[in-house]
Amino acid sequence: MSCFYLDLLKIKDPSFMKRLDIQELEALAADIRAFLITSTSKSGGHIGPNLGVVELTIALHYSFNSPKDKFIWDVGHQSYVHKILTGRANQFGTLREHGGLDGFPKRKESIHDVFETGHSSTSLSAAAGMVIARDIKKEDFYVIPIIGDGALTGGMALEALNHIGDMGKDMIVILNDNDMSIAPNVGAIHNILGKLRTSDTSKQTKTNVDGAFFEELGFMYLGPIDGHDIEEVITNLELAKRAKGPVLLHIVTKKGKGYQPAELDSRGTWHGTGPYKVETGSFIKPAKRAASWSSVISNELIRLAEMDERIVAITPAMPVGSKLEKFAKAFPERFFDVGIAEQHATTMAAGLATQGMKPFLAIYSTFLQRAYDQLVHDVCRQKLNVVIGIDRAGLVGADGETHQGIFDISFLNSIPNMTISMPKDEVEARQLMDTAFSYNDGPFAIRYPRGEAPGVQVVESNTLIPIGQWETIIQPLDAVILTFGPTIELALKAAEQLEIEGYRVGVINARYIKPLDEALLHKILKQKIPILTVEESLLKGGFGASVLEFIEANNYRDVIMHRIGLPDEFISHGSVSIILESFGISTTGLVLKIKEMLAQSGKLRAKRL
């Protein structure tokens, strides 16, 4: 029995591991697993993926010499063990907090984080670039991308496999096969890996049909290997190091290994969590006030699909997060989880639309970026009736730069034929869904944020909202705030506070971001009052920029206008409220800006009420 003990908080770098024997490495794995469970139970985080790669990460740092040898963690949410072994365990108390430890690899955080990830399927292409640079510069180091079986379904990963195999350069690809991405994996490639995973002969011969998939691409295939047997993983890593050309090492792991609630998870619930009770596996959550935005949209989609057999739903590997499981159960023949394949999902929706179907593409804002060409070339250019549910629109908080949903307005605004909308509450969400599926003049995007909806009672209503028509919530007199979605609440609170001080500030619900309500804008501009636009998205190319363009195009002069939104930078992780406050997107920020504009217009005065 080993008496090995190591204070994880005192680790500076991975060099100490070279002195450990297998039994001590196994003890280290147990300590790290316990640390991860205790730490994430307080902070939340991607516990499932990290518990699954404890032994693999230890074996990698034992066999290689980071940072000289380059580890590239595809997606990056499974990099916690790597962070512990590279001297960051003492920062886990700040994991995913504002100014704290990032939940993904971060180059500025450590020399051991050689490439930043967050989205899926990028590691192999990055690795290809590194090995080409290495060989041109005649340098000597290993490049080791670690990619999951879910990420391997992404088209970018397959493009890279094709090129890497053709180049024949030295590279060791680690395929971390845990039979999951966030939700269970789908697709033919997943089925091939499943056959390899359960084959007794695959270790004994390189000529088996399934293993030949990788060998025909030009890779030496090793595996499948038990990813929780440190000694076996190290043995095969050493074998891979001696090989010439690209090697694919197939490692089979168990997501959530060592913590029963996470191990038994088949839905993806333990992929990423908030705080939880270690003893029971129950999540610690504030009392739920209302349904999530995703549920509101999904429930309305089900209602509409019950009345119209042409409605189908598509998701790129996010059925749980997008709350489409109930739809899939109700209409299995009309539900399509295409895997991590945003480009395919978008053009598939276009194809469905050409045949008179009514596709609903449920996709996170951050992942819609990956299908921009398909939106432009295949959907918008052909003016096809595709309804796009843009989930997680706006700031998402703890997941940080790679996942903030702040770019979609800017990149959709510039595409002809695109309609962009965002509801302020559940009623308006249903109305916009009904409007979108009644619209027959091109693509229709509905943005909705992460988290709970406001909790407005939904009544049966078939009211459609005319395209481009805004809602006047408070009639403007002294100034006006134009905004949409969750920032409506901030605007109303600011208007209420300013009314106490004697000012009548209008609030306009600009639920259509594109097209603008031109008639209402003309009316407001003729009042010659200060205009403040507010958006939880980028200012460049955003809603406020569209209003400015309208003002210029219509030759309005001497307009006092200001835009509040997010600056031209990537927004780091942290509490959404703290981030918003830092950019003036708060009740106080709005009040101060309105007063500043009133002073500029000469209307700032003493209280009159």
Curated annotation (Swiss-Prot):
PROSITE patterns: TRANSKETOLASE_1, TRANSKETOLASE_2. It comes from Listeria monocytogenes serovar 1/2a (strain ATCC BAA-679 / EGD-e). GO terms for biological process: 1-deoxy-D-xylulose 5-phosphate biosynthetic process; isopentenyl diphosphate biosynthetic process, methylerythritol 4-phosphate pathway; terpenoid biosynthetic process; thiamine biosynthetic process. Catalyzes the acyloin condensation reaction between C atoms 2 and 3 of pyruvate and glyceraldehyde 3-phosphate to yield 1-deoxy-D-xylulose-5-phosphate (DXP). Its EC number is 2.2.1.7. Thiamine diphosphate binds at residues 77, 118-120, 150-151, 178, 259, 342. Binds 1 Mg(2+) ion per subunit. Binds 1 thiamine pyrophosphate per subunit. This is 1-deoxy-D-xylulose-5-phosphate synthase. Pathway: Metabolic intermediate biosynthesis; 1-deoxy-D-xylulose 5-phosphate biosynthesis; 1-deoxy-D-xylulose 5-phosphate from D-glyceraldehyde 3-phosphate and pyruvate: step 1/1. Its cofactor is Mg(2+); thiamine diphosphate.
